Amino acid sequence: MLNIPENQHNSIEIFTPDQVLENRGRVAIFIDGSNLFYAALQLGIEIDYTKLLCRLTAGSRLLRSFFYTGVDRTNEKQQGFLLWMRRNGYRVISKDLVQLPDGSKKANLDVEIAVDMMALVGSYDTAVLVSGDGDLAYAADSVSYRGARVEVVSLRSMTSDSLINVADRYVDLDQIKEEIQKTSKHHVSYNNFPVSVLDQDRSSR
């Protein structure tokens, strides 16, 4: 049995949240647009995507920020929003919505998110996943095993425990809503889009 001197136990260093953020290195952000949209609805806020990007980066070096969403190419408001996103720091990954038998529309981008997270391992030190979808837990865990830090940002009530369990850090959107909500009307409004033109695949529990 390994005997560790008592004074060595007392010398274990405890890092503050600020010190943890300082060690994030290069950051890559992966945003599940549909999941974030529904979280914002639950919180009763409108997301300011400039503030969101700043908050998620938190002063670290940003490699790239991906935004994944289903699209209706006939919806001019949504196209305008996505154009704004592309011009303001986001790489937009989109997929055409498919109409389901019940009349709703859906575009599942879990595969795209997982593939991009894995493909870029080695280029970033910290992956920030904005989603509560448990289907992404395996990809997040795989990224972690390959040496990257994983942070999950989502609304707790919409987040799978399996995703939280594989994360190095979890941030509840409810705790940072004051920092990321829109306070002016200068930007294109995401909440103006009808739910039918957005990916309606809610997070799995």
Regions found by a protein language model. Give the residues of each.
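Terminal and domain-boundary accessory regions
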Residues: 1-205
